[in-house]
């Protein structure tokens, strides 16, 4: 009955129950007629009316009409007993008060039994119909659930109750031997361990596999993904249990296993008190707030409830979107101020800093696309170098306490304009820190973030959807990858640790071959490598075969926090950096900016 609308289902159940409770008392009377001396038709009508009213009141009290009866179990039977017993007792009391006669208990006992048999039987009939006669018409996909714990049980029951999910749980698997062969709910048993999945998929013609282990680690997820990769089978996972328990997400809001899940790492436990001291009840400004990293920093900052957050960006649409999102989530507790401004506009940056006097600035505004900046090198200088200089000097003038610049691994030994512009931006930050004791300037350096705008993942996904080929520059090219939320959280932690002048380097894990990334995406799309061709296009201008997070002279062996290192980066004086910038602006060339960034003279 779950495929019917809620109102129609309620109406049908109420109508069936009305017929049962109205006529059962008359049937009971005729069964017991030889024993009656005082009962009349009027009294039977009174009893029928009382039963009709009291039953429907009890049904709503015990929520009988909002159950998925096609999956009824003992708990639903207990509800029927409670509702029927309550209505019989109420009727017995009403009739006794009205007539003044002692209640005829056998009549009520027979009526009670008929209610249980007929009402329970109507639900049982529907269950049998759905299971053996009508199930196929609902076009549910046979589903295997990985994990038979609390989350898995919750998910299976939700699938049974919801036709909207279009999933039919067939069985579960779990590596816990104590759960083997147990029945989670009628018809759904734990039938093996995770390694048995391929055999079980073939045996039961499974179309969907759902990982119902909310606290699963990344390495375990990789193992399960490798086991579950089969043609025509989609791998999904349920949301985190914390999101379900908090009400932020429903248990049935499943998501595909993405490459971000496979390349991401187990989250670092942050020093929440330290970060809270930096953000809570403070005014925070984020440049590039509409971008991939900038917008996630804004979300993470708002989780600590600053007094005000200033969303500064050049693109009005992206600022509109993040402003709307944050207002919906945090608008009651945080003053959210969207500002359309360009970091290249020096006067505007000074005006904004002076007006709002932020406690901390997270500078995420930057051009980051290597080939585009090779074709437009002057824009890299204006935005990444001069924009950083304007924003940082405005922050210094307004006596901002913390200035955190988002840098990149491409700033290490840069062979291209984009990386060189970010290295010179780091020089600006460090030199300004030497000039003031009121603002702590710091840079945080990390590699590629998964899923950011302009990254290879959206490109590869698009190419796979179009049937290929997937274009990779070189079979041996590697990159470091990190998820956007992880990078943003570590940026906040690094900012809280900053004492001034540091270039923090985030531990990016092991580098990943781009071709392996492409192969993973092809598998996750449900296709074989043979279905989608991979072609090699050659290294583009300014690209490196591999990236470095620190050069050999910058390596610092000790972590200052889990996954955060302090790079031993060479400092330059403010007047030296100023001279470099003036030379680049007055007589620009690609070679000059790259040479300066690598510690060589301009020419």
Functional labels for PLM-detected ranges:
Residues 284-302:
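N-terminal Rossmann NAD(P)H-binding glycine-rich loop of SDR-like oxidoreductase domains
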Residues 2, 269, 274-278, 431-448, ...:
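Strand-loop microenvironment adjacent to phosphate/nucleotide-handling motifs in alpha/beta enzyme folds
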Residues 2, 35, 129-237, 241-244, ...:
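A solvent-exposed beta-alpha-beta segment
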Residues 201, 205-207, 306-307, 353, ...:
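Proline-aspartate-enriched helix->loop->beta-strand connector
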Residues 1-139, 167, 230, 237:
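Signature of alpha-helical transmembrane segments in polytopic membrane proteins
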Residues 231, 247, 363, 367-370, ...:
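Conserved Rossmann-fold NAD(P)-dependent oxidoreductase catalytic core, especially the SDR/UDP-sugar
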Residues 340-360:
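Conserved Rossmann-fold cofactor-binding substructure of NAD(P)-dependent oxidoreductases
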Residues 221-283, 396:
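Flexible, Lys/Arg-rich cytosolic regulatory linkers and terminal tails that connect or flank
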